[in-house]
């Protein structure tokens, strides 16, 4: 491909609204342009990268025996009503109506559609296991699109779904897909960590996210360097160090705390550790009001709470709603379970410890409050607090380390949630009808592209892994006149005829401009022929990842091809 015949709108300046490297460099390198909030145009260079990522995904999926499909993006509301997710998906799902007043969703995921499609096609255990996938545009009505294509409203996803006669078969495919995902991300040049995760509205039992450690990550990962445990903080069980709770006064008495509503204010006013206090969180869902008590130095983990109560979402109660329960906003004392509100106590609390708690009276707290003495019918304690760095590993009790991460893939064991909803059954070996069990496996294609940039950039620009670079080799020629141009074209044709992906920068611009563009875009290998070549036969080969250039006297095309191919193989070997 010749640059003179290509769209190559590189930019010197960073876009004003870009706050992360991938967003800045995708725009500056001419890979994409913004359409509107969370929507992007992909230009030829960017599209080539996406196509290569898709091809790697396709190859590894096909190796597992998965079959590729293509389903409609527009999905009838009936499918979502049948699974119970028309409401559960919340405001992030785009919903539209046609001229006949029929409702549809722009598919954010396709469990329902594949279930509807495959129900009449699967009749016997002999048809199983079946693993199906597609690579398709999805939609999510993000309230705040950010970080370029990392969190956008329209995105490309590989979504796969597997159907099984039993959990043993599901686990075999789950492990096969787990291995395939590691291979996909390795081939894309990404270092990923599989972490235990919350299944959310997808449902099911086991769930793992493939995370890339990055300071811009929106997820918090908790990792154990001792045993290798890894988990999203949303999922991590809280295991506290015993010394987290210090001694406190045993005498029970009410104390004045004028204007002190928060735990920080109360503990500072009384000169006590936050860990010796109890705080309350007041929430409501569509079906119930919820009152959660936890240790004052901890935060409520909404994902754990929602999973425990099997609710999709919750929001804070208003002061009026709190008062309806006979409680004083800002000064809520521990209460016993009752029929007005669902009461939960976090397992970080000790039943026999004398805590400082609110007195359910304006501007007063009580010290020496022992739960097992003061709260009748104390319920079983639940794990609903957020684990943090320094808390203990649930496997080996070593301290956990926190990292920020970007999710690029997610695999689930869905169980029978969708097969039951759609009545998907087959006859087993004994002729008995069996409800199938499912798995689900997703990869964000655009997000993978952007995350590679986050991991592989420097002050000059991007350095793509050779597997997904828009072109493997760029030929930069600095010529004067027809004769020199023709010689450069000979180099281009020879390289191209060796089945190398070559991008020839034959534009009539200065040498500095060409060299900087090649480094900004991130072509893995650069061959430069310029003034030194036409004077004394000297050419150079540049390794973008190593930022290293080697100059040598041209000794024929066979020698040049050997040098380029050697570097090419070296760069591919790094991805294995």
From Swiss-Prot:
Keyword Cytoplasm among record annotations = yes
Q: Which GO terms describe its cellular component?
A: cytosol
Please list the GO biological process terms of this entry.
Answer: prolyl-tRNA aminoacylation
UniProt keyword list: Aminoacyl-tRNA synthetase, ATP-binding, Cytoplasm, Ligase, Nucleotide-binding, Protein biosynthesis
What InterPro entries does the database record attribute to this sequence? aa-tRNA-synt_IIb, aa-tRNA-synth_II, aa-tRNA-synth_II/BPL/LPL, Anticodon-bd, Anticodon-bd_dom_sf, Pro-tRNA-ligase_IIa, Pro-tRNA-synth_IIa_bac-type, Pro-tRNA-Synthase_IIa_type1
Q: Which reaction does it catalyse?
A: tRNA(Pro) + L-proline + ATP = L-prolyl-tRNA(Pro) + AMP + diphosphate
> Mind telling me which SUPFAM superfamilies this protein's record contains?
Class II aaRS ABD-related, Class II aaRS and biotin synthetases, YbaK/ProRS associated domain
The enzyme class is ligase
Compartments where located: Cytoplasm
What GO MF annotations does this protein's record show? aminoacyl-tRNA deacylase activity; ATP binding; proline-tRNA ligase activity
Q: What is its EC number?
A: 6.1.1.15
Which CDD domains does the record match to this protein? ProRS-INS, ProRS_anticodon_short, ProRS_core_prok
PROSITE patterns, from UniProt?
AA_TRNA_LIGASE_II (PS50862)
Annotated family: Belongs to the class-II aminoacyl-tRNA synthetase family. ProS type 1 subfamily.
Job of this protein: Catalyzes the attachment of proline to tRNA(Pro) in a two-step reaction: proline is first activated by ATP to form Pro-AMP and then transferred to the acceptor end of tRNA(Pro). As ProRS can inadvertently accommodate and process non-cognate amino acids such as alanine and cysteine, to avoid such errors it has two additional distinct editing activities against alanine. One activity is designated as 'pretransfer' editing and involves the tRNA(Pro)-independent hydrolysis of activated Ala-AMP.
Its domain description in UniProt is: Consists of three domains: the N-terminal catalytic domain, the editing domain and the C-terminal anticodon-binding domain.
Describe the subunit structure: Homodimer.
UniProt-recorded name of the protein? Proline--tRNA ligase
**Source organism per UniProt:** Leptospira borgpetersenii serovar Hardjo-bovis (strain L550)
Gene coding for it: proS
């Amino acid at each position: 491909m010749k640059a003179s015949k290509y769209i190559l709108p590189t930019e010197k300046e960073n876009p004003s609204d870009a706050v992360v490297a991938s967003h800045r460099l995708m725009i500056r390198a001419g890979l994409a342009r913004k359409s509107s909030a969370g929507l992007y145009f992909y230009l030829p260079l960017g599209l080539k990268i996406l196509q290569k990522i898709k091809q790697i995904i396709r190859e590894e999926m096909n190796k597992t025996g998965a079959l590729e499909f293509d389903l409609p993006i527009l999905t009838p509301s009936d499918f979502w009503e049948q699974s119970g997710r028309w409401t559960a998906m919340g405001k992030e799902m785009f919903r539209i109506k046609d001229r006949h007043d029929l409702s549809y969703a722009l598919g954010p995921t396709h469990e329902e559609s594949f279930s509807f499609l495959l129900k009449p096609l699967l009749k016997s255990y002999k048809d199983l296991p079946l693993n199906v996938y597609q690579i398709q545009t999805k939609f999510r009505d993000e309230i705040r699109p950010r970080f370029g294509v990392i969190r956008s409203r329209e995105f490309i996803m590989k979504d796969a779904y597997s159907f099984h006669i039993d959990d043993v078969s599901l686990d075999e495919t789950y492990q096969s897909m787990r291995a395939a995902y590691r291979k996909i991300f390795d081939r894309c040049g990404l270092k990923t960590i599989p972490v235990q995760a919350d299944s959310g509205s997808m449902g099911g039992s086991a769930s793992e996210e493939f995370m890339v450690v990055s300071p811009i990550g929106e997820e918090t990962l908790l990792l154990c360097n001792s045993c290798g445990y890894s988990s999203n903080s949303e999922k991590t069980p809280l295991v506290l160090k015993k010394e987290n709770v210090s001694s406190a006064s045993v005498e029970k008495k009410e104390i004045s705390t004028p204007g002190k509503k928060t735990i920080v204010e109360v503990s500072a006013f009384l000169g006590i550790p936050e860990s010796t206090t109890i705080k309350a969180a007041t929430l409501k869902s569509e079906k119930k009001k919820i009152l959660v008590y936890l240790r004052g130095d901890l935060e409520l983990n909404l994902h754990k709470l929602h999973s425990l109560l099997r609710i999709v979402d919750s929001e804070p109660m208003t002061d009026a709603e709190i008062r309806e329960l006979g409680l004083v906003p800002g000064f809520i004392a521990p209460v016993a379970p009752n029929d007005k509100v669902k009461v939960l106590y976090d397992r970080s609390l000790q039943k026999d410890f004398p805590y400082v708690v609110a007195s359910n009276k304006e501007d007063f707290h009580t010290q020496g409050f022992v739960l097992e003495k003061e709260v009748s019918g104390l319920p079983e304690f639940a794990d609903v607090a957020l684990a943090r760095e320094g808390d203990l590993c649930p496997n080996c009790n070593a301290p956990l380390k926190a990292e920020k991460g970007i999710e690029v893939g997610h695999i689930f064991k869905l169980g029978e949630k969708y097969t039951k909803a759609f009545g998907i059954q087959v006859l087993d070996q004994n002729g008995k009808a069996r409800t199938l069990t499912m798995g689900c496996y997703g990869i964000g294609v655009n997000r993978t592209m952007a995350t590679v940039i986050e991991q592989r950039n420097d002050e000059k620009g991007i350095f793509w892994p050779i597997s997904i670079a828009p072109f493997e080799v760029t030929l930069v020629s600095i010529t004067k006149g027809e004769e020199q141009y023709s010689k450069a074209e000979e180099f281009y044709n020879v390289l191209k005829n060796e089945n190398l992906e070559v991008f020839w920068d034959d534009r009539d611009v200065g040498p500095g401009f060409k060299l900087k563009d090649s480094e900004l875009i991130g072509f893995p290998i650069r061959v430069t022929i310029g003034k030194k070549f036409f004077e004394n036969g000297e050419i150079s080969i540049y390794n973008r990842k190593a930022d290293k250039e080697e100059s040598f006297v041209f000794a024929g095309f066979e020698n040049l091809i050997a040098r380029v191919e050697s570097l090419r193989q070296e760069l591919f070997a790094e991805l294995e």
